[in-house]
Amino acid sequence: MTTTRRIRLFLVTLLTTSGVLHFVRPAPFISIVPRRLPYKAGLVAVSGAGELVCAALLAHPAGRRFGGASSALLFTAVFPANVSMAVRSGARPGWYRVALWGRLPLQIPLVLWSLRIAREAGAGQRLVGRSRAEQ
């Protein structure tokens, strides 16, 4: 099994699990939506659906290029919520706060792995549409 395939399977599993949890147990996700944002439950549902769509795209060969790019955008988009959760973790046990702060730098490999999948799935192709030379 190639490294890229292992990474892809890991991301599919991670995104599927997290996406399902957004619907089965939304309360923890609602609690980490930054206070300034309205419609917290709706945002959680949309982000959960987005994770499931990204997982499905990564799982299917025809969707990997777009799925990788979409996953990178998704991991970038949820980063503020992860920061918010870490900042607001004051009354939690020490190990929990360490885990919340420790996971922030882990967003970087998730984004890079997603981009790697997109790049390798579409080697030499544009993500969307045709190049000017093809038109």
Language model features: what each stretch is:
Residues M1-Q135:
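Short amphipathic, positively biased membrane-proximal segments
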